[in-house]
Amino acid sequence: MKYISILGASGSIGTQTLDVIRAHPDEFRLAAASVGKNIEAARRLIAEFSPSLVAVADRDAYKVLYREYRGRTTIVYGEEGLIEAAVCPQADVVVTAVVGSVGLVPTLKAIEAGKAIALANKETLVVAGHLVMAAAKRRGVPLLPVDSEHSAIFQCLQGERMEHVDKLILTASGGSFRDKTRRELAHVTVEEALCHPNWSMGAKITIDSATMMNKGFEVIEAHWLFGLPYERIEVVLHRESIIHSLVQFRDTSVLAQLGTPDMRVPIQYALAYPKRLPLPSAKPLDFISLGALHFAPVDFDRYRCLRLAYEAGKRGGSLPTVLNAANEEAVAAFLAGRIPFLAIEEWIERALERHRPVSNPQLEDIREIDADARAYVRSLLS
C-alpha cells in the first residue's frame, strides 16, 4: 500500500490522480491533499477518501472547513498549509499537480522529507532545476515524471544506459491554433484557445500548449530530468498525440512510447513504479483504425515561445525564472481578456531582454527575480 499526497487535487491532474487511486484501493490511499479555494472539492475528498490532512488556499476556506471537520480531519491553509500537505508523515509519494511556481517550495520540502515525487508541476524544474535535482540527489529521492512526454522517455530508458543515448525527441500536437496563420492568431479569442484538439487540461496549460510555451517548459524539464544538453533535445510536431516521445540511441535505433491520449496512464505509471497495474478505464490503442501517424518540423518563427524557452534554457541561470514568471502573468492577462494572444510572446520577450541574469540563483534570488518579472509584466498593462 502506498500513501499519496496530492498538491492540486481539484485540478485536471489532481482529479485524474484520484481516478487512479479510486481504481486501485488495494494499492493506493489518499493521505493528504490541497484543493486551492475549492471548498466543495474538499468536502467530496473527505467524504470519499478520508485523508488525514486537507490544505486550502486562504483563511476564509479554512474557517468553513475547520468548523465542519474539526477533530476528524486536519485543515490547514496558505503556503504553510501546502507545505504541510507536502511533508505529511503518512505520505510515501507526493504528486505535485499545482500550477505554476507556487509548487517549488513544497516540492523542495517534500524532497527534504524523503518523499518520492510524482512530478506534474513542470515549472518547478523550469525555475529551479539546479536546486531540485541537487536536493533529490542529496536525499536519494526519486523524481518520477507525470507529464506524458517525460513519462514516455523515462519508460523508453528503462534498462538503458544514458551514455548510449544520442538524443531525446519530444512530440507536440501544435495546440489549439496549429492550423492558423500568424495573421489569424492576432484575432483569436480565449474561448478558441481553450479548445485543445487532443487533451483535456486546465486553462493555463491549454494556453501554454497553444503558444507552445508548454513544450518549451518540457524541453527545460527534460534537460534537468535526463541530463542531456539542449542541442540533443528536439521537438517534432505530431498531430495525433499517439507517440508521446522518443529516444534515439547512438546506433540509430529509436524507442518510442505510444498510447491513446489519457493522462491517467502516466499518472498511474508514476504512482505504481516499478510495477505496472491494469487500467480498465483507459482505451487500448487500435492500430488498424488509427491508420496513419503524421509528423512535421517545428517552425520557430511560428512558435516564438518555444524559441524563447530554448534560448532561456541554454543561457540558464535566472532566465528560466523570468521566462516562467512573465509567461504566467501574460497568460493570466490573456485569459482575463486584457491582451491579445500574440502579446503573450511579446511581453515574455521584453521581460527577458530587460533582465540582468544571475548565474547560480538560490531560493531567495529566485523569489526576488520572480516578483520583479511579474511586476514588470503587470506594469505593461497600465
From Swiss-Prot:
Keyword line: Isoprene biosynthesis, Manganese, Metal-binding, NADP, Oxidoreductase
Reaction catalysed by this enzyme: 2-C-methyl-D-erythritol 4-phosphate + NADP(+) = 1-deoxy-D-xylulose 5-phosphate + NADPH + H(+)
EC number: 1.1.1.267
InterPro entries: DXP_reductoisomerase, DXP_reductoisomerase_C, DXP_reductoisomerase_N, DXPR_C, DXPR_C_sf, NAD(P)-bd_dom_sf
One of the GO BP terms on file: isopentenyl diphosphate biosynthetic process, methylerythritol 4-phosphate pathway involved in terpenoid biosynthetic process
Pathway(s) where this gene product acts: Isoprenoid biosynthesis; isopentenyl diphosphate biosynthesis via DXP pathway; isopentenyl diphosphate from 1-deoxy-D-xylulose 5-phosphate: step 1/6
Molecular function GO labels: 1-deoxy-D-xylulose-5-phosphate reductoisomerase activity; manganese ion binding; NADPH binding
Source taxon at top rank: Bacteria
UniProt-annotated binding residues for NADPH: S10, G11, S12, I13, G36, K37, N38, N121, E123, G202
Transmembrane stretches, start-end: none
Residue numbers binding 1-deoxy-D-xylulose 5-phosphate: K122, S148, E149, S173, H196, S209, N214, K215, E218
Enzyme's top EC category: oxidoreductase
SUPFAM superfamilies reported for this sequence: 1-deoxy-D-xylulose-5-phosphate reductoisomerase, C-terminal domain (SSF69055), Glyceraldehyde-3-phosphate dehydrogenase-like, C-terminal domain (SSF55347), NAD(P)-binding Rossmann-fold domains (SSF51735)
Binding locations of Mn(2+): D147, E149, E218
Family indicated by similarity: Belongs to the DXR family.
PANTHER family found in the cross-reference section: 1-DEOXY-D-XYLULOSE 5-PHOSPHATE REDUCTOISOMERASE, 1-DEOXY-D-XYLULOSE 5-PHOSPHATE REDUCTOISOMERASE, CHLOROPLASTIC
Biological role: Catalyzes the NADPH-dependent rearrangement and reduction of 1-deoxy-D-xylulose-5-phosphate (DXP) to 2-C-methyl-D-erythritol 4-phosphate (MEP).
Name of the featured protein: 1-deoxy-D-xylulose 5-phosphate reductoisomerase
Organism of this sequence: Geobacillus kaustophilus (strain HTA426)
Taxonomic path: Bacteria, Bacillati, Bacillota, Bacilli, Bacillales
Gene for this chain: dxr
